[in-house]
């Protein structure tokens, strides 16, 4: 979990912005979005295959 210490003269808004940025860089939001709903293993494999195909096509 991301942790941000609030300085003495720091506003809550700037601390919240730093926390959001830290979570974004750590991939917390993407991970939560990925686990939002259950995904069958067959669907995971299909998505992975499609992503590889898209990557290969772009090169």
From Swiss-Prot:
This is Small ribosomal subunit protein bS21. Keywords: Ribonucleoprotein, Ribosomal protein. It comes from the Bacteria. GO terms for biological process: translation. Residues 43-59 have a biased composition (Basic residues). The lineage of its organism: Bacteria, Bacillati, Bacillota, Clostridia, Thermoanaerobacterales. Belongs to the bacterial ribosomal protein bS21 family. InterPro entries: Ribosomal_bS21, Ribosomal_bS21_CS, Ribosomal_bS21_sf. GO terms for cellular component: ribonucleoprotein complex; ribosome. Residues 34-59 are annotated as: Disordered. Pfam families: Ribosomal_S21. One of its GO terms (molecular function) is structural constituent of ribosome. It comes from Desulforudis audaxviator (strain MP104C). Gene3D superfamilies: Ribosomal protein S8.
């Amino acid at each position: 979990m991301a942790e941000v210490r609030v300085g003495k003269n720091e506003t809550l808004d700037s601390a919240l912005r730093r926390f959001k940025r830290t979570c974004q860089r750590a991939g917390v939001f993407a991970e939560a979005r990925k686990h939002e709903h259950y995904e069958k293993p067959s669907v995971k494999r299909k998505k992975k295959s499609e992503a590889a195909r898209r990557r290969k096509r772009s090169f």
